[in-house]
């Protein structure tokens, strides 16, 4: 900031600058790269939702491919019933229980801001999903599905991903890698599960990941700008992308081993594999980026 000028001998003018205000005691200024990364997460998440909606909902070609992927990932009725039973347990009670854990962990560690961020992330992502699905977005009838009700984004996937991210926000640094791994497995299993049951198309699942990514970036940006960094804050380089990817691969292998695979042609198998891989990579990226951008004390 330009503070003023000083004259020397009537000829020379020297500019002086007012120093930037120091961070609050016990805090450090956020790195610009992390602020940029959090901002990019918000933009990327929003852009992903918009692109999926325009390409796979608004266009006839997109609807055809999306519906074909849905049909090729279907499995036998017995497996579907089992998956429905598991997904039905993702109720409001589960959300409240996980949020309660987040609150307790944050308060015990003296990090009220992180408890607030976790609650805002879960509430914001799930409310946004419901508003988009039932209020703001419509699905034109191009003749490729039996229902014209919009199903993008997936509510169940939003619940799973947002809860995994909330736990990642409040957990101590030593447990972050394990949470990235477990969260990637759980979120991918739920994402694949809602497609297998026929509740959602693949684009719905990926859109819910985009919603969660945007909200994770938003609350991370708030934590960074408010000065939640401390001198002991540390990050593992890259945010454990390897563990996130391993978790997604484990989830896909678990689904295949359980019988969630097509019984048709090689073409069906390729489409099936690409679909579950896209879901797994999307959830892994979301968790890895959030782990990278959020400060964690030992």
Regions found by a protein language model. Give the residues of each.
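Membrane-water interface at transmembrane helix exits
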Residues: 105, 129, 133, 137, ...
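Interfacial segments of alpha-helical transmembrane regions
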Residues: 36-40, 104-124
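N-terminal transmembrane-helix/juxtamembrane module of multi-pass inner/ER membrane proteins
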Residues: 2-93, 133-144, 274-278, 282-298
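C-terminal TM-helix exit segments that contain a strictly Trp-centered aromatic cap at the helix terminus
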Residues: 47-58, 128-137, 193-197, 249-260
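Membrane-embedded catalytic cores of phosphoryl/pyrophosphoryl-handling enzymes
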Residues: 144-279
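Alpha-helical transmembrane segments of multipass membrane proteins
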Residues: 48, 125, 129, 190, ...
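Hydrophobic alpha-helical transmembrane segments of integral membrane proteins
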Residues: 116-145
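Hydrophobic alpha-helical transmembrane segments
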Residues: 87-110
């Amino acid at each position: 900031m330009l503070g003023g000028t000083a004259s020397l001998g009537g000829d020379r003018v020297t500019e002086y600058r007012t120093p930037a205000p120091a961070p609050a005691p016990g805090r450090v200024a956020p790195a610009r790269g992390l602020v940029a990364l959090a901002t990019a997460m918000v933009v990327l998440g929003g852009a992903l939702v918009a692109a999926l909606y325009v390409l796979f909902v608004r266009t006839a070609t997109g609807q055809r491919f999306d519906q074909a992927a849905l049909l090729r990932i279907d499995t036998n009725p017995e497996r579907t019933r089992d998956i429905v039973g598991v997904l039905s347990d993702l109720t409001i009670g589960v959300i409240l229980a996980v949020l309660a854990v987040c609150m307790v962990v944050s308060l015990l560690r003296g990090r009220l801001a992180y408890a607030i961020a976790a609650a805002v992330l879960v509430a914001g992502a799930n409310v946004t999903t419901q508003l988009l699905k039932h209020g703001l977005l419509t699905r034109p009838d191009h003749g490729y599905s039996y229902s014209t009700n919009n199903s993008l984004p997936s509510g169940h996937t939003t619940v799973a991903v947002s809860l995994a991210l909330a736990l990642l926000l409040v957990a101590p640094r030593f447990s972050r890698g394990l949470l990235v791994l477990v969260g990637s497995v759980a979120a991918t299993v739920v994402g694949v599960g809602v497609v297998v049951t026929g509740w959602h198309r693949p684009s719905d699942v990926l859109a819910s990941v985009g919603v969660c990514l945007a909200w994770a970036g938003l609350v991370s940006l708030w934590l960074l700008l408010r000065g939640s960094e401390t001198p002991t804050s540390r990050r593992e380089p890259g945010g454990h992308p390897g563990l996130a990817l391993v978790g997604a691969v484990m989830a896909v292998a678990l689904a295949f081993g359980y019988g969630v695979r097509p019984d048709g042609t090689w073409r069906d198998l390729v489409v099936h594999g690409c679909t579950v891989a896209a879901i797994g990579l999307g959830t892994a990226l979301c968790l890895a980026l959030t782990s990278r951008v959020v400060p964690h004390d030992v």
